[in-house]
């Protein structure tokens, strides 16, 4: 099942862990034709960070931040279930 969150920018994301280890996340942006981004966990100072080199997803305390890695353009922060 997908977890659906809305960000402060009103961007809607859906994401899920694809295995029990929580090392890989599938994430889709609802305004991007439902393209599924397959994100792998990378080192993070705080929380958990996942990326595919294009999209970055940072999780901390049941909130997320999503951005485009190459341009550092923010898609949304404060993403959570609403």
Q: PLM ranges: what are they?
A:
Residues 1-82:
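Cysteine-centric segments in proteins
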């Amino acid at each position: 099942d997908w977890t659906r969150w809305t960000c402060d920018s009103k961007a809607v994301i859906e994401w899920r862990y694809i295995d029990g280890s929580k090392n890989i996340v599938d994430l889709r942006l609802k305004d991007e034709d439902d393209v599924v981004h397959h994100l792998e966990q990378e080192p993070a100072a705080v929380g958990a960070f996942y990326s595919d080199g294009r999209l970055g997803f940072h999780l901390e305390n049941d909130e997320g931040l999503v951005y485009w890695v190459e341009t550092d353009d923010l898609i949304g922060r404060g993403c959570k279930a609403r």
